[in-house]
Each structure stands twice: as C-alpha cells, then as structure tokens.
Amino acid sequence: MITEKPHHPYYQQTVDETLTNIQSSLDGLTSAEATARLEKYGENALPQKPGKPGWLRFLAHFNDVLIYVLLAAALLKLIMGHWVDMFVILGVAIINALIGHIQESNAEKSLQSIRNMLSSEAVVIRQGNHETIPTTALVPGDIVVIRAGDRIPADLRVIEAHNLRVEEAILTGESTVVEKSSDALHGELPLGDRYNLLYSGTTVSSGGGKGLVVATGGETELGHINQMMSDIEKHRTPLMVQMDKLGKTIFITILVIMLALFVFSLIFRDMPVSELVLSLISLAVAAVPEGLPAIISIILSLGVQAMARRKAIIRKLPTVETLGAMTVICSDKTGTLTMNEMTVKAVITADTTYRVEGDSYEPVGNIHPVDDPTPVTVTQGSVLERYLRTVDLCNDSQLIKDEQGLWKITGGPTEGALKVLAAKIPLPAIDAELRSKIPFDSQYKYMSTLYRLGDEEVMLITGAPDVLFRLCQHQQTQNGLEPFNLHYWEEKIEEYAREGLRMVAAAWKPAASGQRELTHADLQEGVILLGIAGMMDPPRPEAISAIADCLQAGIRVKMITGDHPQTAMSIGQMLGIGNAASAITGRELEAMDDHQLSEAAQKYDIFARTSPEDKFRLVQALQSKQEVVGMTGDGVNDAPALKRADVGIAMGIKGTEVTKEAADMVLTDDNFATIARAVHEGRRVYDNLKKTILFVIPSNIAQALLIIIALLAGNLIPLTPVLILWMNMATSATLSFGLAFEAGEKDIMNRPPRKSNLHVMDGYAIWRVVFVGLMIAISAFVLEAWLQPRGYSAEFIRTVLLQTLVTAQWFYMLNCRVTDGFSLSKGLLANKGIWIVSGVLLALQLLIVYAPFMQMLFGTEALPFRYWIITFLIGFAMFMIVEAEKVLTRRWRTTKG
C-alpha cells in the first residue's frame, strides 16, 4: 500500500512536491521511519491466494451427475458381490476423471509468472547512506538507486535521470525503449506516456538515476494486474454449459424411469428385489453415455494438434470449440494486422511528390512521381539525391540480410524505414567522412550529423516535421534555394496524414570549413528543408484476405491501436474492416458509463489511442451484448483482458510470458491470418463434436429401450452392465475417432457463428437421435424375439444383440459423416481415420466374440458366420433409411424456406 493519494497523480508533480506529499527527502527515510512504514503498509510483495491441491482438483472431476450414476451403480455392484462389474464401472469413472484432470489448464501459472517478475534486492538511500535490502522491505518514501540492467523493484517517481532508458515491453507490449526524465508532466496521460514514472517489473536498459518509491506490493501497476487476474472468473464455454445441461437431463430422465420401473416391476411382475436392482443398474449404465466426456476431450485434443500445425497453440482445451462460436475479434494493429515493418510510401520535395513501391524491409521497389509511373533515376546534386543521401547518413540503423535470406533492420523502425528507402535506388558513389553527431532525443526530436561529403562539408538533420520547420528559413528546389513555405508543407502533411502516413522531415546546412564539432546552436539558423517522407506500417496481405474471410463468416473484426484516429481509420480501410470510416478514442471510452460503452462497442470497429484498461472494459461491454469475444494482446497489462475474453489470444513472438499464460491461444507467428485459420478449425471441430454426440446417444437410447421393454414384458434382460460398458467405451469411443478426422464441410466459413445459447441438441438433433435409437432398438428387439423361441442360450442371444448394435453403430457412423448430404461421398476415402477405426473395431469384435478369456469375462459365445451376414444386412438397411430421412429433411427445410 502507499501513503494517502495526492490531489494530482505523481507524474504531474515536481520532484519536490512528490517528496513533500510522500513525506520523504533526498537523504531517504530513517531506519525507524522505514520500520514503521513497513509495519503499516506491509511487505513489497504481491498478495496471493492459496491454490487448490492436486488431489482436490482431481476429485473435482467426479462432480458430475453422470459420474454419480456410475458411482452409485458401482456401489450397488459391490454390495451385491459382483466384483468384476464393480471394477469395470469404477474404472470407467476414474478414466474419465483422469482425462479431465490431465487436460485441465492450471490458471495459477499466470499469477506465478507475474510474481516471478519481481526482483529480489534493491539499493536504497536511508539516512544518506547506500544500503542493499530485500525488495520485500521497500516502503513508500524509500529512495532507490537505479543502474543499467536492474529490474525495477516497485513503482517509482524518477527524481534523477542520467540517460535513463527503460524497457517497458513486459508491461505495455511496446518494444521501443522509453527514455525517462524527472520533469513534471501535464494532463491525463496513459501509462506508456508517463516518462517520469518507473514500473515494478520493468528493466533498465541503459543509464541510471534515482527513484522515489510511490507504490509497493498490491498497489503497484503490477499489483493491480495481479489483483484483476485473481478476481476474474473465466466464462464457461458454451459446450461445457450444454454438456452439463445434457447430463442433468439424462440423469433426471433415468431417475424417473428407474423409479417408475421399480414400482411397476414390484407390483405387476413380482420380480425379486435383487434381480430388479441388477436390471435397473443395467438400465442406468445403458442410458449414461460414459465415454462421451473422454471422447469430447480427445477430439478437442486432436483439434489442438491440428491448430498447432497451423501456428496456433491452444492452451485450454474448450477454446477449440469456443473459436467456432466467436462473433467478434478485437485485434491489436501493429505486427498482427500489419507487418511491423515501417515502410516509406511517399517522398515530398518542394518540386515533386514521389510514390515509393515495396512493402517490407527488402530494398526493392521503384520511386516515381505521383503523376508518372516511370521510375526515376537519381542524379548527382538533385533534390531527391540530396534527400536520400541525408536520410541514409543521418541514421543509426543498419539494413542486414540474415542467414535465412530475410532482410532485417537494427535500430528504430523509423530510421530503418529511411535506410531501406535510400537502399532502393543506387546513389552516386561519394567519399563520406563522419565528424560529429547529435543523437536523436525525445526532448528535441531530431538527429544531426556532421559529414565531409567529397569536397563539401555539411550538417544533415532528420526529425519531426514541426521541429525542423521551426529551424528552416529556406527550402531546396531544383532551381536552388527559395524561402521556406510553411503553408505548402502543412497542406502536404494533412493530405498524407489522411492516408495514415507518419511524416519525417530531412534538412541540411553547409558547415564551416574544417568544422569538427556539432552543437545544437549550429542548427538554430540557416537550415534548408529538403523534404518529408511519409511512412506507414503496411497491412499484411494475408490479414486483408483473412478479415474478408471473417466478415464472410459473420465475425466482426475490431482494430485496437495506440495510433492517431486518422491513421487508424486509414489502416482500417486498407484492411477492409467493416466500419472504418469512424473511430473512437480511449479518452472518449473512459468518459462513458457501462451502458454507453456497450453501445459504442457495437457501433465502432476502430479504437484509437487506447490503453489495456480500455481493452478490459471493451471485452465486458461486448460480452454484455451476448457477443463471444476474441481479444489479442502482448503486454502484461493486456493479461486481464485476455483472461476475461472468451478467447484470449497472445502473441508468441512479442508477447510476455504472463500474457501467454493468461491466454487461451498463442499465435507463434503473431499473424491475424492465423486467427482466421483457427476459427475455421474450431468450426470443423465443433461440427465433428456435434456429429459425435449425435452418433453416441442413439446407442444409449437403443440399449435403454431394450432393457425397458424387457422389464415391462418380464423377459430376459438382453444386455449385462459389462456388455453395455463395452459398447459405450470400446465401440462408441473407437468409432467416434473416425468422425474426429472428418474434414470441414464446404460452407463452413460462409455461415454465421452459431449462437452461444443454441444447444448442441437442437430440435433436429433430438429428432435424429430418438429416430435412430428407436430404429436400432426395434431391430434388436425383433431379432431377439425371433431367436428366443429357437432355444438359444442367453449368452448366445446377448452376443447376437451385441453384434447387431455394434454393426448398426458402424453404419450410423457413416451416416453422421455429413450432416445433410449423401454420406458415401468421395471424402469418405480421404478420411483415413474412419478406415483405421473400422479395422480396430473389427479386431475388438473378433476378440470379444471368439477369445475364450473375453467370453468368460463378458459372457459371450462364438457366432456362426451367417449371423455376421444377418447383422450386416440389418445395419445396411438402417443406413439407407437414415440417408432417405436426410433427403426428406433437406426437402422439408427447402420448402419451409
């Protein structure tokens, strides 16, 4: 905690005001005062909640109504002494819990990553003396000595700075080094613009200084993020909610039927209680799709592997299906929608405006006048030659080609863009000698070099146009010098700003003969403007097509950037973002209440000058409108927004570890197109999950109906619990994997996102599973009725029924391949998974029917070959009936409109 908050933020106060408000001095605190404050405010450490132990998280996976049914069945089997059945049923419950536990994402890791960012020791000034203390002992009012390489131990107000530069990417995601000063700042500023504050967890890249501790522990920026991460409750995914509802529905239905049958059988059939309980256990086990949770987890895992091959790492399994329901993607601009390679697109001189071709650091692309596509040739002494020479030599960056043949720059992106520009056209050779340099500094916003160029001695200057305009008295033209025309240059800047270009000016001045030193005073008069360059971070070509795909798929793309609104709108229009004609700023968002924000979140697609806090509120606002939100981020302070989003998307290259831990998905290439590919894969996986659910449940319905009919008729129970578990775990699970490998259907990205509240078991799905379940049950019942009078043993009849149900399932799996179309399409041969699982199923059936130890364990008998033919024909007939049902349903839907 910190001392009482001042009326103005610390960054708006002078050093003396801050020291007074926090009751400290340049000599630091006394030992007694430090001890008192430590007792009052607590240790400088992030608060943490105790995590659940592993065994408790494992037991939580038994908290499911369907698992309750299995555990109750196992307990009854134990009481009745049926050990084999008990172990098999209990084993199924444990396997399901193990799979869920293994796949569970440990959310505590993201909080631990934040805590790991804190340093262990700090050098402080107390009573005028330097002391090294544990960072946990820091208190508000301590003076911390800062050196290059240090990790900042608390939030500090800079009171002394010597070329102090800090790497804040770990907090903000911005890769540029921030220069710090002790000067007071004015107005409300976002976190990244508070140049006199140092934040806990960031790193000093160069220079040094001193800082006054203004916040410790949970009151630091890092502490606020830690608290937000602890408080955020992750939304349960639509599928998780639906499967819970489905489980409860099945549970209640089973309970009602079992009670009704128990009463009916006792009154009208006079069955022994022990026999009745065994029959009802069989019914419970038959009606519960035991394998479904494991099947869903494994299909999602296969989706994770497929996405990893497409450069999207899924960290939390349910994310795979959530991607298919996503309605909005909020994406950062730099590096995700754009190339993160600043590129010059225009050069403006007093005589001519040039267009520059090329969209990357590769030094390829012509330069030509805007009204003439003919490439220019640079001649010695021309204005363009002098301009290109200036931006090349007044430049600290380097253009290099790496081992993979890719062009890269070292240094800042703006200087890098100018270096690439100069390399696009060969300049006439000239002997150049650097004599002196004034490095770029954010305080004066320009850079200057003193060169001898051949026989000429010149000062070269590059920097912000508004700064250089104040220094210039003349401008260079093809005909020599003429008075500086401010109106002309301001018009050009306004014109190209509308295209989203950032402007950099270049100028020169003759130097005195033999001059060896360069000072700021040398540049205060006599400077001649050469021109300005307009540059931008160009859109990724693949992002443009990916956004078009998303819009086609009914997904709105919203761009979030720290850029100026005009620049943001221009980039948005190039990308093809929906409503790119208007933008809203972070400051406007901050002034809105929750209702106004939810309306603005729906209305606007371009969000400029935004902060990570705006991102968090934006996610909440969109979710309040029932949107399923994907959010990208890279800095630590993006982590709460990512954790809150339905799909948090972290950048794999420039993202921090904390952000990656908080995210559901990590892009290994930081590319928006990868998100679009992941959406395609998510929809495919969801389709296959739905097909799998439609495939599994009819078998349970058929098994349950067979037992219900037998109880009502007072007949032999056709299937034992272990045979039912064999069907549900071995047969259903095996065949389900064939559907998991099914390719996406043709219209997968031409349909809108599914509604998150739309149940996987919609009206048509319920009709289908009931229809198929009844058909399988009736077929098996008729076959059983035909076999019983012929004197076959109970074991033989059960084996024939098992074979009938398994064969019917295999054919129905083929039906489920395609939702509406004919299932025996050419894609059937392309899906190798179906043929692999078919082979495995055949081997399993041969084993359970003919292997003596399996016959003993499961109570089966060997079948003559003719019964394989009979069951095959029954299955094929059902396949054709379901295909006919699909045709009729399709026609009915078409007629209905």
Predicted features and spans:
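Conserved cytosolic headpiece of P-type ATPases
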Residues: 1-750, 760-761, 774, 785, ...
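Generic alpha-helical transmembrane segments
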Residues: 730-731, 776-777, 799-813
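Membrane-water interface at loop-to-transmembrane-helix junctions
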Residues: 755-774, 794-800
